[in-house]
Structures are given as structure tokens and as C-alpha cells.
Curated annotation (Swiss-Prot):
Disulfide bonds: none annotated. PANTHER family: MEMBRANE-ASSOCIATED PROGESTERONE RECEPTOR COMPONENT-RELATED (PTHR10281), NEUFERRICIN (PTHR10281:SF4). This is Neuferricin. The keyword Transmembrane does not apply. SMART domains: Cyt-b5. Residues 1-22 form the signal peptide. It is found in: Secreted. The cytochrome b5 heme-binding domain was proven to bind heme, although it lacks the conserved iron-binding His residues at position 82 and 124. Residues 44-143 form the Cytochrome b5 heme-binding domain. Heme-binding protein which promotes neuronal but not astrocyte differentiation. Gene3D superfamilies: Cytochrome b5-like heme/steroid binding domain (3.10.120.10).
Length: 273
């Protein structure tokens, strides 16, 4: 009991020191790693880009922090990844949200501007944010693009959240679409590519195999290989008794692969096809 009271008193002292001197726990000797969660202030800390930049894990650094979508995390326990020489060291001391999706780890790419990311990319970025929230200590917020000087969300953050919501809806739509048109299996060689269908292709278990077809995305020239049910009524009319027993083959978004037998469950494609 006395030990618990002593810890509570120490934590309270740390909070008072922070409020008087405006210092984070990691800057108070002996406290930063003793009670990191117990002593964490509910409102969090507001940091500028300049303040965050000194938490890069380098010589004389105060620790290892990074930010994603304006939220700051202490990633010290992952120092082998985020510290100097680590595979993710370029994320330390900054908000490089865009680079998580683009893979551009140059100075130009390690930025927090996410306005050009697609809804699905933003959804994946949000998954990264959730990962840090679940695995690392939240320090506070980074003022600038996503939070103002008072810690309130900016229009940029509101816009980002709207795009994430669109991404979530697209993901749900894609999951439903995949049930009707599961992705093909595929493998590559130096000269060709093989696509084929099975009762578990695309990770979608079903009682039919189907045949490979190109499925185009509305309004674009892009397509993906899907497996199409080639018997019974179309999916849009499952109870129809008046059909030509072609399943979903007549869907207008589908096209046959050239030089492939349309009845086969597999197809060899030249690279670039």
C-alpha cells in the first residue's frame, strides 16, 4: 500500500513539474520510463515540428518520437527499427504520413501532405495509425497541418477523415464485389503470366470454380482478373427461371482475355497483357 501511495505521490509531483516547467516526462530524470502510462496527461502534449525533430534518436536526442496524421507516439521501445540505422529510422522526429503509402523515403517524400492519396490509401494509412495507438504510448499532437496551436482539428484533418470514410465504404463494396467476382490466382515467369480459378481463389471459398475474365473499373482503363461463375442465373436475378445458363458472363464490365479459350479455367498471358 505504501509503495502504491509513494508511486502516486511521485506521479503527482511529475505532473506538477510538467505544468510548471512545460516539460514532457521523458525530460524529467528518473520519471520518463518509470511511470510512462500512469503519469500520462489525458490532454496530451502539443508539439511543434521543431520540437518533434529533436526526438530522432540521434546523439543528444531526447528520445524517439514520430507522428502520423498529426498524432505523436513514443516509439523508443522499437528503437531497433526507428533508431539510427534502423529500417524505419527515416520516420523518427517527423510526421511523414504520405511516405507510408507512397514508399518515397526521400526528403521530398517524407512529408505530412496526404491530399493526393486515394481513399483506399488513406484507409491503409489509418490502419497504421491504429497500429501505433495499440502498440505505442501516445504523447500528444503535432501542431501544424492536422492540429492548430490549441490542439483542435484543422480542416486538413477533417478532410482526411472524410477520405478515410470513403475508403472504408469502398473496401466494404470491394468485399461484396469479391464474393461475386473473386480475384484470380496468378503466377509469373520471366516471359509469361498464368491466371487461373479454383474454389478458393482470391481467398473466397465457394462451391464453384469459374473462368478468368478481365473486369474493368468504371470510368478507367484499369482492370483486374476475376473468376466468373459460368452457369446458372446471373447474380442479380438468382431466382430467375428464364436465363441462358451463363451465370455472370454477360456482365458488361467483363471482357475475355485474347488468345485464351473462354471456357478454360486458366489462361497463359504474355507479360504486359
Amino acid at each position: 500500500m505504501l509503495g502504491y501511495l509513494a508511486a502516486a505521490a511521485l506521479c503527482l509531483a511529475a505532473v506538477l513539474l510538467m505544468r510548471l516547467d512545460h516539460l514532457p516526462l521523458v525530460d524529467i530524470p528518473g520519471l520518463g520510463y518509470i511511470f510512462p502510462q500512469q503519469c500520462e496527461l489525458s490532454e496530451g502534449r502539443l508539439m511543434s515540428k521543431e520540437e518533434l525533430s529533436v526526438y530522432d534518436g540521434g546523439p543528444g536526442s531526447s528520445g524517439i518520437y514520430l507522428a502520423i496524421l498529426g498524432q505523436v507516439f513514443d516509439v523508443h521501445k522499437g528503437s531497433k527499427h526507428y533508431g539510427p540505422g534502423g529500417s524505419y529510422s527515416f520516420f523518427a522526429g517527423k510526421d511523414a504520413s504520405r511516405a507510408y503509402m507512397t514508399g518515397d523515403f526521400t526528403e521530398k517524400g517524407l512529408v505530412d501532405d496526404v491530399t493526393e492519396l486515394s481513399p483506399l490509401q488513406m484507409l491503409h494509412l489509418h490502419n497504421w495509425l491504429s497500429f501505433y495507438q495499440q502498440n505505442y504510448i501516445t504523447i500528444g499532437k503535432l501542431t501544424g497541418r492536422f492540429y492548430d496551436e490549441s490542439g483542435n482539428p484543422t480542416k486538413a484533418l477533417e478532410d482526411a477523415l472524410k477520405v478515410i470514410d470513403i475508403g472504408l465504404k469502398l473496401k466494404e463494396e470491394r468485399e461484396e464485389e469479391n464474393k461475386q467476382f473473386p480475384p484470380c490466382n496468378s503466377e509469373w515467369s520471366s516471359e509469361s503470366k498464368r491466371v487461373w480459378c479454383s474454389k478458393n481463389s482470391g481467398g473466397i471459398q465457394r462451391d464453384w470454380v469459374g473462368v478468368p475474365r478481365k473486369m474493368y473499373t468504371a470510368g478507367t482503363n484499369g482492370y483486374r482478373c476475376v473468376c466468373v461463375r459460368n452457369f446458372g442465373p446471373p447474380s442479380e436475378q438468382p431466382d430467375s427461371t428464364e436465363h441462358n445458363d451463363r451465370g455472370d458472363l454477360d456482365n458488361p464490365m467483363l471482357h475475355e482475355y485474347e488468345d485464351c479459350n473462354p471456357l478454360f479455367e486458366w489462361c497463359f498471358l504474355k507479360n504486359g497483357t
